[in-house]
Amino acid sequence: MAKKIDAYIKLQVKSGSANPSPPVGPALGQKGVNIMEFCKAFNARTEKMEKGMPIPVVITVYSDRSFTFETKTPPASYLLKTAAGLKSGSPRPNTQKVGTIARAKIQEIAELKAADMTGADVEAMTRSIEGTARSMGLVVEG
């Protein structure tokens, strides 16, 4: 018989550095999940990734307090900032541009994000990520 799902918890945790402090501890503690068990499993799964990269994670909590989790790809905004070498986007993206990014790099990001986006082709995802880049104050070249 399948386990009864009690809750889904969505968090963004930095790769390789999950610990019981907020936001992980309170979110899991409310559902009675073993926090250290999650932290060890998450850190083991993300140890090969760049340290400090924000990783969206969906934790499925079952009624017997056991859990499973699924990691996603980093947010497009993080990948764009990293590719353009920026610390943050523009506070006024319509008037103040902060950098440029090649369309080929956006295509790479779209292909990386394809695992998380269902039902969209790579061309549509590329256009979506171009829009994200423009809203961050990046100029798309190429």
UniProtKB/Swiss-Prot annotation:
Protein's recorded name: Large ribosomal subunit protein uL11
Highest taxon of source: Bacteria
PTM per Swiss-Prot/TrEMBL: One or more lysine residues are methylated.
Described purpose of this protein according to its UniProt entry: Forms part of the ribosomal stalk which helps the ribosome interact with GTP-bound translation factors.
Disulfide bridge partners, by residue number: none
GO biological process: translation
UniProt xrefs under InterPro entries: Ribosomal_uL11, Ribosomal_uL11_bac-typ, Ribosomal_uL11_C, Ribosomal_uL11_C_sf, Ribosomal_uL11_CS, Ribosomal_uL11_N, Ribosomal_uL11_N_sf
GO cellular component: cytosolic large ribosomal subunit
